[in-house]
Amino acid sequence: MTQSQLRNGPDDNGLFGAFGGRYVAETLMPLILDLAREYEKAKEDPEFLKELAYFQRDYVGRPSPLYFAERLTEHCGGAKIYLKREELNHTGAHKINNCIGQILLARRMGKKRIIAETGAGMHGVATATVAARFGLDCVIYMGTTDIERQQANVFRMKLLGAEVIPVVAGTGTLKDAMNEALRDWVTNVDSTFYLIGTVAGPHPYPAMVRDFQAVIGKETREQMQAQEGRLPDSLVACIGGGSNAMGLFHPFLDDKSVEIIGVEAAGYGIETGKHAASLNGGVPGVLHGNRTFLLQDDDGQIIDAHSISAGLDYPGIGPEHAWLHDIGRVEYTSVTDDEALAAFHQCCRLEGIIPALESAHALAEVFKRAPNLPKDHLMVVNLSGRGDKDMQTVMHHMQQSQQEKH
């Protein structure tokens, strides 16, 4: 693909270069093909697009502001830093952008039951939210480890009428929850719509989720033009599966002047093996219906990912990111737990904004880069979610470090 066609993928088989595809059980194939057909039709349907725009505006609260972070900029003493304020959306993160799109599709297809997987709980909450709004049954699969560290979100899902099913398999995190959701889907093919929360899974999910999230990047283009009269020089976003990043990046892929940086979770450090950086520390393989970079051992078994942030500890990454990494269009770096925590505290103190620990990974990368850039360099960081859900984790870490000092 030439530079001018970077936004055209995937091909008809759902491939971005060597990544993506449809690796699913035979029973699911008709459903997947049906979903792809319905999505292609919906994309061209003015009524569908009109309804989507209505809910984005009046229910989600879009457009989200592009905010000049004056104090962060002063602190870094270099690039001019803008925050794309996705944490101000209804439910507190970017996840709702995709959920609104998919729930409208589910309704269009006559589905009565929604299932989803969740890690940090934000996608679970957003799914339960839209299911409540459209009066559909909702079942959320969530690993027991994540349930423990995200109790407030579990309670929110139940308040919204969803059934939360604990997954004890594996490490009881996102990968295991996704496995269970896929099993459920195979069993309940006719009535059920699987609302995947990230740019992973079998085709058409990676492209569909990206398209619903691309509202982030489209707004950013317009807002930056309005505020600065030109495009940004660089974009920074954190990456778990990669939907908030893809939403910001995709509308800029063909703009050669825009540098794009994705930030993975390095956990305790890439060299320790305790991390969630699939591109910086993984190899290609197949998981959850698509071929992408994965954390694997020498026998090809999936290794458990680690991150302080429940939303980043996925052992894979969206196939489009794998491809963009492969062709060198996007630079993928990583940030440790400690670096993310430090950035979290800086953002709280300097801007009065409590970011999600996921978003704090992107901020940490900004703190590394911005001081070395000229003052007219325009940098946009995707503030993908708010940190309310992370209070327990941060409190726990602060107590731990206090104890270690004594």
UniProtKB/Swiss-Prot annotation:
Cofactor: pyridoxal 5'-phosphate
Keywords, in A-Z order: Amino-acid biosynthesis, Aromatic amino acid biosynthesis, Lyase, Pyridoxal phosphate, Tryptophan biosynthesis
Pfam families: PALP (PF00291)
Database matches in Gene3D superfamilies: 3.40.50.1100
EC number: 4.2.1.20
Residues modified as N6-(pyridoxal phosphate)lysine: K95
Enzyme class: lyase
UniProt keyword annotation of Thylakoid present: no
SUPFAM superfamilies: Tryptophan synthase beta subunit-like PLP-dependent enzymes (SSF53686)
UniProt keyword annotation of Lyase present: yes
InterPro entries: Trp_synth_b_CS (IPR006653), Trp_synth_beta (IPR006654), Trp_synth_beta/beta-like (IPR023026), TrpB-like_PALP (IPR001926), TrpB-like_PALP_sf (IPR036052)
GO molecular-function terms, A-Z: tryptophan synthase activity
Catalytic activity: (1S,2R)-1-C-(indol-3-yl)glycerol 3-phosphate + L-serine = D-glyceraldehyde 3-phosphate + L-tryptophan + H2O
Family assignment from sequence similarity: Belongs to the TrpB family.
Subunit details: Tetramer of two alpha and two beta chains.
Function: The beta subunit is responsible for the synthesis of L-tryptophan from indole and L-serine.
Protein name in UniProt: Tryptophan synthase beta chain
Organism the protein comes from: Pseudomonas fluorescens (strain ATCC BAA-477 / NRRL B-23932 / Pf-5)
UniProt gene name: trpB
